[in-house]
Amino acid sequence: MKTDTWKGRDWIAETDYTREEIETLLDVAAELKRAFVLGQDHDLLHRKTLFMVFYNASLRTRNSFEAGMTQLGGHAHFLDVAKIYAPAFANQLKASHSEDIADSARTLSRMGNGIAIRCFGDAVGWQWGMGNAVVREFARWSDAPVINMECDWYHPCQALADI
Protein backbone atom coordinates (compact mmCIF):
# COMPACT_ATOMS: atom_id res chain seq x y z
CA MET A 1 0.00 0.00 0.00
CA LYS A 2 1.39 3.36 -1.00
CA THR A 3 -0.62 5.48 1.43
CA ASP A 4 -3.52 5.32 3.83
CA THR A 5 -4.06 9.07 4.17
CA TRP A 6 -7.51 8.82 2.54
CA LYS A 7 -8.93 6.76 5.41
CA GLY A 8 -11.67 8.55 7.32
CA ARG A 9 -11.88 11.47 4.88
CA ASP A 10 -14.80 12.75 2.84
CA TRP A 11 -14.80 12.15 -0.90
CA ILE A 12 -16.91 14.77 -2.61
CA ALA A 13 -14.85 15.74 -5.67
CA GLU A 14 -12.41 13.75 -7.75
CA THR A 15 -9.70 16.23 -6.74
CA ASP A 16 -10.12 15.59 -2.99
CA TYR A 17 -7.49 12.84 -3.16
CA THR A 18 -3.95 12.98 -4.49
CA ARG A 19 -2.71 10.86 -7.37
CA GLU A 20 -0.93 8.59 -4.88
CA GLU A 21 -4.14 8.14 -2.89
CA ILE A 22 -6.12 7.32 -6.05
CA GLU A 23 -3.46 4.80 -7.12
CA THR A 24 -3.67 3.17 -3.69
CA LEU A 25 -7.46 2.97 -3.90
CA LEU A 26 -7.20 1.33 -7.32
CA ASP A 27 -4.56 -1.15 -6.08
CA VAL A 28 -6.66 -2.12 -3.05
CA ALA A 29 -9.81 -2.40 -5.18
CA ALA A 30 -8.03 -4.65 -7.70
CA GLU A 31 -6.77 -6.92 -4.92
CA LEU A 32 -10.20 -7.14 -3.26
CA LYS A 33 -11.87 -7.85 -6.61
CA ARG A 34 -9.33 -10.58 -7.36
CA ALA A 35 -9.93 -12.17 -3.96
CA PHE A 36 -13.71 -12.02 -4.47
CA VAL A 37 -13.44 -13.77 -7.86
CA LEU A 38 -11.35 -16.48 -6.18
CA GLY A 39 -14.01 -16.94 -3.49
CA GLN A 40 -11.90 -15.47 -0.68
CA ASP A 41 -14.10 -13.73 1.87
CA HIS A 42 -13.11 -10.45 3.47
CA ASP A 43 -14.46 -8.86 6.62
CA LEU A 44 -12.74 -5.54 5.99
CA LEU A 45 -16.01 -3.73 6.78
CA HIS A 46 -17.26 -6.12 9.48
CA ARG A 47 -19.80 -4.37 11.74
CA LYS A 48 -19.61 -1.21 9.59
CA THR A 49 -22.73 0.56 8.35
CA LEU A 50 -22.99 2.89 5.38
CA PHE A 51 -26.09 5.08 5.21
CA MET A 52 -26.95 5.76 1.57
CA VAL A 53 -29.18 8.82 1.11
CA PHE A 54 -30.76 8.82 -2.34
CA TYR A 55 -32.48 12.00 -3.47
CA ASN A 56 -32.53 10.45 -6.98
CA ALA A 57 -33.44 7.03 -8.32
CA SER A 58 -30.57 4.66 -8.99
CA LEU A 59 -29.94 1.17 -10.25
CA ARG A 60 -26.19 0.73 -10.77
CA THR A 61 -24.96 3.07 -8.04
CA ARG A 62 -27.24 1.68 -5.36
CA ASN A 63 -26.54 -1.95 -6.22
CA SER A 64 -22.79 -1.50 -6.56
CA PHE A 65 -22.57 0.15 -3.14
CA GLU A 66 -24.84 -2.45 -1.51
CA ALA A 67 -22.98 -5.35 -3.12
CA GLY A 68 -19.59 -3.92 -2.18
CA MET A 69 -20.58 -3.38 1.45
CA THR A 70 -22.01 -6.92 1.69
CA GLN A 71 -19.01 -8.52 -0.02
CA LEU A 72 -16.70 -6.81 2.48
CA GLY A 73 -18.77 -7.81 5.52
CA GLY A 74 -20.59 -4.51 6.11
CA HIS A 75 -24.14 -3.30 5.74
CA ALA A 76 -25.51 -0.65 3.37
CA HIS A 77 -28.68 1.01 4.64
CA PHE A 78 -30.79 2.50 1.82
CA LEU A 79 -32.62 5.76 2.58
CA ASP A 80 -35.05 6.93 -0.12
CA VAL A 81 -35.95 10.57 0.56
CA ALA A 82 -39.35 9.98 -1.09
CA LYS A 83 -40.18 7.63 1.79
CA ILE A 84 -38.58 9.41 4.76
CA TYR A 85 -38.41 12.96 6.05
CA ALA A 86 -36.07 14.37 3.42
CA PRO A 87 -32.94 16.07 4.73
CA ALA A 88 -33.11 19.75 3.73
CA PHE A 89 -31.40 23.05 4.49
CA ALA A 90 -32.72 24.79 7.60
CA ASN A 91 -34.34 27.54 5.53
CA GLN A 92 -36.14 24.99 3.31
CA LEU A 93 -37.77 22.79 5.94
CA LYS A 94 -41.38 21.72 5.44
CA ALA A 95 -43.42 20.45 8.40
CA SER A 96 -44.02 16.69 8.28
CA HIS A 97 -41.87 16.38 5.13
CA SER A 98 -38.26 17.22 5.94
CA GLU A 99 -35.54 17.35 8.58
CA ASP A 100 -32.55 19.63 8.92
CA ILE A 101 -29.46 18.30 7.13
CA ALA A 102 -27.30 19.21 10.14
CA ASP A 103 -29.47 17.11 12.48
CA SER A 104 -29.67 14.25 9.97
CA ALA A 105 -25.90 14.20 9.40
CA ARG A 106 -25.09 14.26 13.12
CA THR A 107 -27.60 11.50 13.87
CA LEU A 108 -26.56 9.20 11.03
CA SER A 109 -22.87 9.66 11.81
CA ARG A 110 -23.51 8.57 15.40
CA MET A 111 -25.23 5.38 14.24
CA GLY A 112 -23.05 4.47 11.26
CA ASN A 113 -19.57 4.63 9.87
CA GLY A 114 -20.20 6.56 6.69
CA ILE A 115 -22.81 8.50 4.74
CA ALA A 116 -23.10 8.36 0.96
CA ILE A 117 -25.31 10.84 -0.90
CA ARG A 118 -26.74 11.10 -4.43
CA CYS A 119 -28.38 14.46 -5.13
CA PHE A 120 -28.88 16.41 -8.36
CA GLY A 121 -31.43 17.65 -10.86
CA ASP A 122 -35.10 17.50 -9.96
CA ALA A 123 -34.30 16.79 -6.30
CA VAL A 124 -32.89 20.32 -5.98
CA GLY A 125 -35.18 22.09 -8.41
CA TRP A 126 -32.58 21.95 -11.19
CA GLN A 127 -30.58 24.67 -9.42
CA TRP A 128 -26.99 24.18 -10.55
CA GLY A 129 -24.72 23.59 -7.57
CA MET A 130 -27.46 22.80 -5.04
CA GLY A 131 -26.81 19.06 -5.16
CA ASN A 132 -23.16 19.71 -4.38
CA ALA A 133 -24.24 22.08 -1.60
CA VAL A 134 -26.37 19.31 -0.05
CA VAL A 135 -23.45 16.86 -0.10
CA ARG A 136 -21.10 19.45 1.41
CA GLU A 137 -23.63 20.37 4.10
CA PHE A 138 -23.78 16.71 5.14
CA ALA A 139 -19.97 16.64 5.25
CA ARG A 140 -19.90 19.81 7.33
CA TRP A 141 -22.03 18.27 10.08
CA SER A 142 -21.11 14.58 9.93
CA ASP A 143 -18.43 13.06 12.12
CA ALA A 144 -18.32 10.08 9.73
CA PRO A 145 -16.85 10.29 6.23
CA VAL A 146 -19.22 11.45 3.48
CA ILE A 147 -19.04 9.97 -0.02
CA ASN A 148 -20.55 11.72 -3.01
CA MET A 149 -22.43 9.08 -5.04
CA GLU A 150 -23.23 11.79 -7.62
CA CYS A 151 -24.17 15.43 -7.48
CA ASP A 152 -24.61 18.11 -10.11
CA TRP A 153 -20.89 18.94 -10.05
CA TYR A 154 -19.04 15.71 -9.31
CA HIS A 155 -19.29 11.93 -9.63
CA PRO A 156 -16.02 10.73 -8.06
CA CYS A 157 -16.92 7.05 -7.75
CA GLN A 158 -17.83 6.87 -11.45
CA ALA A 159 -14.62 8.71 -12.30
CA LEU A 160 -12.67 6.07 -10.38
CA ALA A 161 -14.56 3.27 -12.13
CA ASP A 162 -13.80 4.86 -15.50
CA ILE A 163 -10.03 4.71 -14.92
Locate the predicted segments by residue.
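Phosphate/diphosphate ligand-binding glycine-rich loop within oxidoreductases
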Residues: D43-I163
